[in-house]
Structures are given as C-alpha cells and as structure tokens.
Regions:
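Short, positionally conserved secondary-structure boundary motifs
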Residues: 1-61, 68-74, 81, 96, ...
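Short beta-strand-centered aromatic/proline hotspots
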Residues: 74-77, 86-88, 100-108
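Glycine- and charge-enriched low-complexity intrinsically disordered segments
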Residues: 93-145
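Residue-level detector of beta-strand face positions
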Residues: 41, 89-91, 117
Length: 145
C-alpha cells in the first residue's frame, strides 16, 4: 500500500476489527489500486450527535481511505471531487504553519473564493470556513469502529 507523506514516519500496527464483505471488498480494491487507507482515532465530541447512525463519539476509531484529490491546485479544478455532507478526515496546515487533523464534513464548497465550510455534527461546535489551500489531504470515513 502506498504510504501518504503525512505518515512517512508512522508506525504501522496490525489492528483487528469486524467488517462486512462490502468493506472487505473495498479494502482489497484499495490494496490493488495502491490507495492509502488506515484506521485513525478521533478525539473530542465535535462529531457526536443524537443520530446514532452517523454519530462519531469521542475516542472512536474510523476506517478511512485517501480520496486522492489534488489539494495543491485551485478549488475550481477539483470542487466536483469533494464529497459534501459526509464524514471526512481532513489534514492541513494553516497560513501560520500549524498542522491540523480533523474529522468533519464539508458542508459547502466555494470555488470562487477558494474555501470550504467545515461542519461538525455536534450543534455546540461552530462551522469553520477555511481556505482550500490549507488542506493537504482528504480521506473519506468508511466505517466507525
């Protein structure tokens, strides 16, 4: 499997978890296509909500795969590839150099102003409008473990 630049020095560990044949097929396809995937922990309650079908509680682990969106280009070129209103793992770096790693949805894409609106499921957390050029990678959450 192709390693993503953000995880070059990461330790790879084996993790047993239950998944159905649909997920098994996806994992096999990611391996064949050399698409990065992994299991990551979530911290905080921003994605916790009363809808238990989508809630991602604090301390959950999520299975994700790299959407392979070229985040080094202007949003106008890739806006149609970005899933909206679906849980994503988003990695980036602010204009001051602070790295971030968040589990959010992208509720809207503004290609004119080159920014996206990050949304939390928890209504106690405000939406955040960020420049698209802060984002370095976008991963789609496939399963909450």
């Amino acid at each position: 499997m192709k390693r993503n630049n953000h995880f070059e020095n990461a330790k790879i560990i084996s993790l047993d978890f239950k998944y159905n044949t649909e997920i098994e097929t996806k994992i096999d396809n990611w391996k064949k296509e050399n698409i990065f995937f992994g299991v990551f922990p979530t911290i905080g309650d921003s994605m916790t909500c009363s809808d238990l079908t989508k809630s991602i509680p604090n301390g959950s682990k999520v299975l994700v795969y790299d959407l392979q969106i070229n985040c080094n280009t202007v949003l106008d070129n890739v806006w149609h590839q970005i899933p909206t209103k679906e849980p994503l793992l988003i990695i980036g770096k602010t204009n001051t150099g602070k790295e971030f790693f968040v589990c959010k949805t992208i509720s809207s894409v503004d290609a004119v102003n080159n920014c996206v609106l990050l949304h939390s499921y928890n209504p106690m957390h405000q939406d955040n409008l960020i420049p698209f050029d802060w984002i370095t990678n976008i991963y789609k959450v496939v399963q909450i473990l």
